[in-house]
Amino acid sequence: MKKKLWIASFFCLCLFASCGGDDNKVPDWNWGEEEEEGGTDKPEAKEKPRYVWIDAAGNFERYANSIDNIKEDLRKVKETGFTDIVVDVRPTTGDVLFKSSVAEPLKRIDIWSNAGYVWAERTATWDYLQTFLDEGHKLGLKVNACINTFVGGYLCPYGLGYEGMLYRDASKKKWATVINATGRQVNTMDLQNYETDWGVKFLNPANNEVQEYLLSLLSDLAKYKPDGIILDRCRYDDYGLMSDFSPESRTEFELFIGESVENFPADIMKPGTDIPGKWYKRWNAFRAKTIHDFIIKAHDEVKAVSPDTRFGTYVGAWYSTYYTSGVNWASPKYNPAADGSYSRWADSDYKDYGYADHLDFIFLGAYAAVDKIYGSTEWTVQGFCKLGGAKLMGDVPFAGGPDIGNGSGWENGGQANQVPKSINACINACDGGMFLFDLCHIRMHNYWDACKQGIDNYLKTVK
């Protein structure tokens, strides 16, 4: 869930880059009205799960070579009242922290440290994921493994360099996304200016070779039999509607609509713009179907190897604009084409590509500003959760959670009073519990007591 960095100062950038979140381009914020803290949901007898995310990059310096540090922090996680951990084992470079027959092991990642912006290296040979599974289970924690899905490399800012499969294997360039730039279609691997093009290099979700590769990787991951497997960045890339306009995508789209596109790509969107053409809504449906169909394949791949492992995704809760990522995470019973302004981008069959009914659980990023906890609209933590639940329509248990290190007002710490409120807003609005992103922020800003207070306040309502 790693964001683009908001470079305001060296200090803010250090905090931000050390532990980021998936937040592709977002719209103007709609704050809505504040509500009373307690919410209106009635207490439930059964405890809901409490997850804490463990981002690979944000925690790499502390965990990559130290089992003792992992043990120490997991004890704190348990004592604080969390029930589950979500361990990121495939960051945006695409390399992995588990044994795989198809992916390279993660050996280094870019971080901000006391020494500045540097590469952090892993020299240890012990199994990273297995260690979390062993140590977490000893404490009674459930251990979920998370991967960044359609990613294959990372170009660092400041000239630090790059890493990942797309950079090591030139033959994989055809797997990278192609954007609908002004005047021509451009493979993102041809965009290598570290001042303007830095960030994640995505893979094309419509490329069948890419999908087969990722399914093999998921099969390897499922052999660990974690309590859950979660797909992050299972979407199109940060260029939004400009992606993907490769020959492979054109071929698949024409099969989808049953005819040739006479003027590609302008009949979909005018190059370099988001001005819609005649096929615009069908293109949005095609992209959503591409992700929907991959979710089904991924679910089946995991279950074939480890039937008891729960399968889910992380998505941004901003449904009103998440279509630009090619994802419909809602229930297929929810029809956006009949829901006000959504009809401008959603065709009548867009609902058919909602994938919530193919999941065991889902995580909604409720990434609002620090002073926008309670409310009923998007861009409030509580509103994100309530609106998300309405679109999921009971198809899947869902957990919402804030980003307590990167969102507006959270960046510099000192927000311990807002952490319990965030926990309250999420856990009472979500039937599947809550999560916090990320453990590195809890540790960095010493939010342990604040987390425990929020969880204890909730537990008092169910006992």
Q: Locations of the language-model features?
A:
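Active-site neighborhood of glycoside hydrolase catalytic domains
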Residues: 216, 220-224, 228-232, 237-238, ...
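Active-site-adjacent "subsite" loops/lids of carbohydrate-active enzymes
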Residues: 44-64, 145-224, 276-280
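Substrate-binding cleft/loops of secretory-pathway carbohydrate-active enzymes
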Residues: 152-155, 239, 305-372, 376-377, ...
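Bacterial Sec-dependent N-terminal signal peptides
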Residues: 9, 13-47
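Catalytic domains of carbohydrate-active enzymes, especially glycoside hydrolases
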Residues: 68-95, 224-228, 351-364, 426-434
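Aromatic- and acidic-residue-enriched segments that line the glycan-binding/catalytic groove
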Residues: 97-110, 151-194, 233-272, 324-335
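Aromatic-lined carbohydrate-binding/catalytic grooves of carbohydrate-active enzymes
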Residues: 82-124
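Substrate-binding cleft of secreted/luminal carbohydrate-active enzymes
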Residues: 347-463
